[in-house]
Amino acid sequence: MSKEIDWRKSVVYQIYPKSFNDTTGNGIGDINGIIEKLDYIKLLGVDYIWLTPVYESPMNDNGYDISNYLEINEDFGTMDDFEKLIKVAHQKDLKVMLDIVINHTSTEHEWFKEARKSKDNPYRDYYFFRSSEDGPPTNWHSKFGGNAWKYDSETDGYYLHLFDVSQADLNWDNPEVRQSLYRIVNHWIDFGVDGFRFDVINLISKGEFKDSDKIGKEFYTDGPRVHEFLHELNRQTFGNTDMMTIGEMSSTTIENCIKYTQPERQELNSVFNFHHLKVDYVDGEKWTNAKLDFHKLKEILMQWQRGIYDGGGWNAIFWCNHDQPRVVSRFGDDTSEEMRIQSAKMLAIALHMLQGTPYIYQGEEIGMTDPHFTSIAQYRDVESINAYHQLLSEGHAEADVLAILGQKSRDNSRTPMQWSDDVNAGFTAGKPWIDISENYHQVNVRQALQNKESIFYTYQKLIQLRHTHDIITYGDIVPRFMDHDHLFVYERHYKNQQWLVIANFSASAVDLPEGLAREGCVVIQTGTVENNTISGFGAIVIETNA
């Protein structure tokens, strides 16, 4: 078993198994592929690996549509493989976090199959079925496009799906549903996993089923019984363990996230929120093409840092995951090799000096970029394909639609991990399930490890700093120069220590503002700071005299 780790000082490495490492040649990553690369992950220095879902699934939403919570998808391997992964990871002092989806199941799940058999079936109340003679019961929108209700002709009723039509929402108001889910969570605890990431967990409590003058999310986001349900989940499953738990929170608030994570409330350890990753949306709409609103990014990051700190909660900090574009393409610059490397290092430093638990998404540590696909045929993500057809139907030109997908598609982060400059980036001996980014000859793990100045070693150093300096984990945060057009500046204070963080989000050199005391020891740096000027995409952390 791995050594005890203070989860607040821990760093998590997210693995998207389908795109990580294929050992069978079928073009799909697998569990044995993860085992094969554990030494690499250990070298990076993280404490946990988080696997996106590996359960049985028809894969309409790449595993987030679970048809059997207690079996491993054969594409990824076997239960024996998963057991071996946990054993080998623990031998290397790595903990394993499972992604679990308990807001909805696949429509291929046995519960849903039973529910469709008749209106009197006991599993009918596991889901939200409603009769309606006038079309869908409400005008709520699915997050994947279209109405959130699907007509089922088998029993002449509509069922709720906040996501894809193949993902039916579970009725948490039904105690039998909750107990069934708690048994599943306890099964995996007994199996030996060390933590859980709960998908869209703040949507589990639905309120009134009324028409909305918006898209309906006000009726189910942070719903009326959500804190009651999470407290019960905690008490009946992981609450008496040292497991790390994190909830993915959709369109939530600071106030609710404090409640979700205050230790005395006994709900979750920490939360993901995504407000800082909507700063390139136009009027809150994802499927638009927009530049980074830098002032808004700083404002949101600091609101959440201060709010969670003051409220005694705990937040995750991250730039990337399996649902987001690659940050170096999004907020940095991938147009040249020099700019890619420099901006990736700057973004890493800017984020990892914040309070919270850092999550590093596979490939982020080597500066992987968006793939810049040029055809809809290259996309695999159901949300992106739906958006493509929706935008075309609204009259947008195809070139404009592809440009939007190129900026916002979830497939940007789902291209295979680039291990080397060998065929297929060393990911597979077969045909990969999705195209590999064409820059793998320059951007790959092999090259990163050979160059001590690479992005990889910046991430490694940042992880080491978090493990060894309490100021990063426990210190207060003070924003500085929030009105500056290019610099992200903040201080960290803890006991008699004070650190100053300066990050230049511009490709050009920037003069440092007056009043910015910079005397002290350099903790970590990328780029240069000379003659009161910081280089393009430069960043520096200085331990100053408090």
What are these regions (language model features)?
Residues 45, 65, 192-194, 318, ...:
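Short loop/turn motifs at secondary-structure junctions
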Residues 97-98, 197-200, 246, 318-319, ...:
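Generic enzyme active-site microenvironment
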Residues 168-174, 327-341, 442-453:
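Active-site rim elements
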Residues 188-198, 315:
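Active-site regions of oxyanion-processing enzymes, predominantly non-cytosolic
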